Structure formats: C-alpha cells, structure tokens
C-alpha cells in the first residue's frame, strides 16, 4: 500500500472474503441473465495497467482467510510461464464487437507491471498456505510486533516499472547469484 503511495500510483486493495471459492472474486464474471460482464476493481486495475508504465500494486489483504489455491490458482500458474506473452486469462469464451481494446478473443494479457502483494495471518480463523503458493512467493515473516518509530518525511517519487526493471537487471548483472 505504502509503496504505491511512494511511487505515486495508489495500490488496489482487495479484501479477501472467507466465501471466495474461485477466480470470479478477482476477475469478475459474465452474467448470463443480464448479458453483462461484472468486473472487479482488481480486473479494472489489471486492464488499466496495460496502458501505463507504472508499478501497479494489487494488495490481497488477509489472503488466507479463504483458500489461496482456489481463487488465485489460475494466476499462480500464469505467473510461472516464462513467456510473458502467454500471461493471459480467459474472461469470456468468445469475443464481441464492442469488447474493450485489450481484450483479444475473450483473453486479457496480464502486464508485467502488475505486482501482487498478499498479507496472511497465522491463527485459527485462517487456512494454512500450501507449498504451491510458498514456492511462488517472496515471503517476509513478521514474528513479533514491530517497535514504533518515526520515519522522516520523504517526498513521493514517480518511479516507472521500466526504471525498476532496469535496476533489477543491473543488480543481477553486478551481483550474479551462483
């Protein structure tokens, strides 16, 4: 959340609910009765990310209050694909004349500038997180409550995804992992 504030690109917050059972909660669904697609804030952010070079942060708050493997399964698989052009989710089975520009044959490409951040708790109201999720995540454990401190006022700075990606590539070249 704060990283989005610092980068001048607000994060999209998705408060995970215990009833989440499938991808519809994140990406929306086509309503056969109304013949309209019910979109979510997460889907809107993914779509809009294709039009900018910002770091687009999506926060899944309390993501293990429902089973991550159920509602985030498709995204876990997509993010493992080495070819970023294959990072697609099927939103509808076919295309229509008035489909949004970035929707091709019912599919939406997930831009690389979308970052998912999840918070998880470890208590009796949550589900354990499977190895499938842990294997695809960068985990930061906070085992105790932090000590309050005053941070210096820091001016926000627009940092593009391209800039961050360039810094990553430079760091990988300068400090190779053996």
Please tell me what each predicted stretch does:
Residues 166-170:
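Amphipathic alpha-helical segments of the small helical/lid subdomains adjacent to P-loop NTPase cores
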Residues 171-178:
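Basic, amphipathic alpha-helical bundle interface domains used for macromolecular binding and assembly
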């Amino acid at each position: 959340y704060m990283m989005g504030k610092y980068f001048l690109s607000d994060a999209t917050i998705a408060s995970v609910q215990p009833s989440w059972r499938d991808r519809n909660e994140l990406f929306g669904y086509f309503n056969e009765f109304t013949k309209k697609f019910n979109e979510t804030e997460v889907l809107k952010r993914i779509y809009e990310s294709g039009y900018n070079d910002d770091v687009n942060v999506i926060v899944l708050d309390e993501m293990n209050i429902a089973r991550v493997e159920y509602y985030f399964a498709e995204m876990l698989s997509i993010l493992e694909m080495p070819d970023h052009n294959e990072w697609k989710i099927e939103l509808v089975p076919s295309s229509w004349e008035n489909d949004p520009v970035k929707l091709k044959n019912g599919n939406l490409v997930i831009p690389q500038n979308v970052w998912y951040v999840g918070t998880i708790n470890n208590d009796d109201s949550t589900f354990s997180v499977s190895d499938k999720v842990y294997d695809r995540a960068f985990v930061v454990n906070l085992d105790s409550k932090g000590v309050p401190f005053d941070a210096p006022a820091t001016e926000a700075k627009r940092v593009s995804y391209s800039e961050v990606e360039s810094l990553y590539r430079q760091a990988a070249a300068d400090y190779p992992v053996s």
